[in-house]
Each structure stands twice: as structure tokens, then as C-alpha cells.
Amino acid sequence: MSSLRQTPLTCSGHTRPVVFLAFSEINSDGIYYSISACKDGKPMLRQGDTGDWIGTFEGHKGAVWGVDVNKDATKAATGAADFSAKVWDALSGEEELTLQHKHIVKSVNFSNDNACIDCGGGAAGGDASRGGE
């Protein structure tokens, strides 16, 4: 049985439906984060246990369908209806990488070593640490 608190949270801020949530791993201090994909095109990073807003990743033109955050919550990835996937510095909110696709990107996932991302809905992926090389 998990010792984590299991209290439902209501997190305001999105103007359209949320379509997906992803969570970081729990760090040594017991802290974890969540990121939301939303039809408003503005994924939000939040404190996992409280739902407190940390920041919004702005740069997609259209609905964001897929999100992920790496294990230590230093990077975030987003996939959207604008045919792109993006990697963000989760600490500063700065966009680090954009991968263009031929179709809507509906899912993004960091690899277990956090070095690469896989993107669903198109056939591209990239090196999350070296600008897609």
C-alpha cells in the first residue's frame, strides 16, 4: 500500500479540456511533478501533491495532445496539433528543441536514460540533449 496521500485535486487554469497527464518520479525529498496536455495549447507544470501551478509552456499553435516529464523533472516534452514536438527546460520554461512532423503528434515519451524522446503520430524522434541529432 502506498504511503502517498490520495486526495483528489482540482487544478484551475486551462480554458479547454485536459486530454493527458504525466508525472515525474518521486525524488529523494518526496517531491514529484505533473504536466498536463490540453486543447488550449498551453501545457502546465504543477507540484504533484498539491496541484500548485509552477509554469506554462507557451509556443505551440494548436491543441497539445501529449506530454512527458523526465525522471528528475528537469525537462518536459510536448506534442501537438501543429505537427511539432518540443523539448523544454522545465526549470526555466525555455524551449530547447523543436521536431517537425508530417502529422499531429499525439504522444511523447522520454527514454529511460532521458537522452531521447519518442514521438507518436509521426515517425520522428530526437536526441533530447543535443538538439535532435
Predicted regions and their residues:
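A short helix->beta-strand "capping" segment at the edge of beta-propeller domains
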Residues: 1-16, 50
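A structural motif specific to WD40 beta-propellers
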Residues: 6-8, 52-55, 94-97
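Beta-strand-rich domains and repeat architectures in extracellular enzymes and scaffolds
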Residues: 10-41
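WD40/WD-repeat beta-propeller blade N-cap
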Residues: 11-18, 58-64, 99-105
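Conserved strand-to-loop turn within each blade of WD40 beta-propeller repeats
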Residues: 37-40, 78-82, 119-123
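WD40-repeat beta-propellers
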Residues: 43-47, 85-89, 108, 124-132
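Asp-box/WD-like beta-propeller blade repeats and closely related beta-sheet repeat scaffolds
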Residues: 93-115
